[in-house]
A protein has these predicted regions:
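Domain-level signature for soluble enzymes in the chorismate/prephenate branch of the shikimate pathway
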Residues: 1-290
């Protein structure tokens, strides 16, 4: 039996994504909900779970930085992805439709900022660990409003005050991408399918045009960059007078594709200082493109 951990409680979009990813695994699975993304990552790293599911990217709000950092710091591998449309609603207890406080996950509050401004601009917004936790809190306290999926609100017996209240961008439905992570690579290469690969690059050198060099290498090896994120380096990098940066690149292709392998080798050669055997490029995993 495979144990899969995910951010709880159960009635969240993460829980739904976890169930969908579990259906692809050709073994019996047990789903375990935990209190935080860090707990999910550590449960896998410490062999308490075989796999974990974490939100990685939202169409409206962008990158979930903590997700990639936890994968990197715990030396995990991304082996799958699930994309879910996100449709958020507002619920209240039938005995008390107080509007003084609105509860939800910080990302959900941000994704509904326009609707909240139009309808409840004077309400205090209070973050919770998940959307389902917000629904549970309002149900138990019999006060306030909760933003969650309609299913979660109904499960906790709340009245629907507003439906599909998320911000709209160019008429596109909001979505979140979720990663399935494990301790080892698990996505085999099939030439008939399309893949994405997440690569972490921590240059131990600095020169003008360094980022352009990285992007030129992917272009030279006929690889398309889907996303690029930068952040202060997580590793100890000694570059005098500068704040060292690292880059996450999501690239179309599988880690075992010949072009990808050649590109990774080239980046490793160019990004590390001469005469020092330092890890500067790490492949965080390959997964089927949604």
């Amino acid at each position: 039996m495979k144990i899969i951990s995910h951010l709880g409680p159960k009635n969240t979009y993460t829980g739904q994504a976890t169930r969908m990813l579990a259906e692809r695994i050709e073994e019996e699975t047990e789903l375990v909900d935990l209190a935080s993304l860090e707990a999910v990552a550590r449960s896998v790293a410490l062999h308490e779970a075989d796999m974990g599911v974490m939100a990685y990217y939202n169409y409206l709000e962008g990158l979930v930085q903590e997700c990639l950092d936890l994968i990197y710091e715990n030396d995990l591998k991304i082996t799958g992805m699930q994309r879910l449309p996100i449709v958020l609603s507002l619920g209240a207890h039938s005995e008390n439709h107080s509007t003084a406080e609105v509860y939800s996950h910080p990302k959900a509050l941000a994704q509904c900022s326009g609707w909240l401004w139009d309808h409840y601009r004077d309400s205090k917004q209070i973050p919770t660990t998940s959307t389902a936790a917000a629904a549970q809190r309002v149900a138990e306290a019999k006060s306030g409003l909760a933003i969650a999926s309609s299913e979660a609100l109904k499960k906790y017996g709340l009245d629907l005050v507003g439906e599909d209240i998320g911000n709209k961008r160019y008429g596109r439905t909001n979505f979140t991408d979720f990663y399935l992570v494990a301790r080892e690579n698990g996505c085999a290469f099939d030439k008939t399918r399309e893949y994405l690969t997440m690569v972490a690059i921590t240059p131990h050198v600095d020169r003008p045009g360094l980022l352009a060099e990285i992007l030129q290498q992917t272009a030279y090896h006929n690889l398309n960059n889907v996303k690029i994120h930068s952040r202060p380096a997580l590793d100890d990098v000694a570059i005098e007078g500068l704040e060292p940066q690292m880059f996450y690149l999501e690239v179309v292709g599988h880690r075992n594709n010949d072009d990808m392998r050649r590109c990774i080798d080239s980046l490793r050669y160019k990004m590390k200082p001469e005469g020092r055997d330092i890890e500067v490029v790490r492949v965080l995993g390959s997964y089927e493109r949604p």
